[in-house]
Amino acid sequence: MPDSGLLYKEWRQNKVALVITILVFILGNPLSILNMYLIYQGCVTGKENWVGPCVFSVDYLNSSFISLFWIWGVVLAVSQLGIERSKSFFDFTLSLPYTRGQIFHAKFLTGGMVIVVPQLIGYVLSVLLIMLLKPDQAVYFHNYSLGMIIVSMLAYSLVMAGGALTGNSFAQLLVSFTVAISPFLLISLPVINLEILFGGSIDFIHGPVPKWVQYFIPIIYVDSKWAENSPYYLVIPAIMTIIFYIIGYISFVKMSNERNGYFFLWKPLNRPVQIIVIIIGIMGFGYFGFTASESFAGYLIGMGTGAVIGFLISYFAIYKKMKLL
């Protein structure tokens, strides 16, 4: 259990973000139900302006406030690591009489409690509200409400891991987003380029893929369609949350957090990542050039353009130190 002094410091330092997040998590779920109820009441009082029967349905796949809860996990992680480092508060934090492991645990516990507890409170309030309003049906309510807690923690732990590897907020967000779409970048994009080069279709990418495989792609949880499937699939983001937590913890403890402003805290990562960015730029723009011109010449021009853009982006993002706030 982290020291109470560290927990208090986290609260004081990130109080605005924490309070806003708590309020959003507590009120978001009940407000979603109230919004659906008001829409139903609007139908009842103005039937002549509506098509079809008036049905009070709590349908969480048809847009709700809680569909964006994962964003607040991102906001908390950036506030706790990226912004703190950019404002040069991190040197003070590391000078406190605590180990780096204790500091990371305090940050993660604070963020985790703010994500989990208020959402559980909002869930209980929503259950009571449903019992009071008695909707005709509640579609995916329990699966989506409880699953969003896991999804929010996944977003939080992913961005915390990104922040433990990087030296500024921009780098933290960029690395986190790249990891979120990494299966596409590492598998689908190379296969698409191989199809262009060899002029044929590769069965691996177009053949049947088990449904559970897609849930290893973090970005997939931005779309609420995951709630339609078995709740057992939520074991996958729960496991990924633990993995990202471990990566973040090890990176925070082992790397030179004092190197404020740089893209990566560990310099040996710079060159390999730059090469990967250039390769992705070549493949991405090559595919775009081929689809735009439907010719191999367009593919080559796209590859050349991607190489230049990939080099420039990687050079200025990775090797140029950002000014501190």
Curated annotation (Swiss-Prot):
Keyword flag Ion transport: no
Name of the protein in its database record: Probable ABC transporter permease YtrD
Upper taxonomic lineage: Bacteria, Bacillati, Bacillota, Bacilli, Bacillales
Membrane topology: Multi-pass membrane protein
Main localization of the protein described in the UniProt heading: membrane
Function: Part of the ABC transporter complex YtrBCDEF that plays a role in acetoin utilization during stationary phase and sporulation.
Keyword set, alphabetical order: Cell membrane, Membrane, Transmembrane, Transmembrane helix, Transport
Transmembrane segments: 16-36, 63-83, 113-133, 146-166, 179-199, 233-253, 272-292, 298-318
Family: Belongs to the ABC-5 integral membrane protein family.
One cellular-component annotation, GO: plasma membrane
Binding partners and assembly: The complex is composed of 2 ATP-binding proteins (YtrB and YtrE), 2 transmembrane proteins (YtrC and YtrD) and a solute-binding protein (YtrF).
Induction details: Negatively regulated by YtrA.
Subcellular location(s) per record: Cell membrane
InterPro entries reported in the protein's UniProt record: ABC-5_transporter, ABC_transptr_acetoin_YtrC/YtrD
Superkingdom, natural source: Bacteria
Region forming the signal peptide: none
Organism: Bacillus subtilis (strain 168)
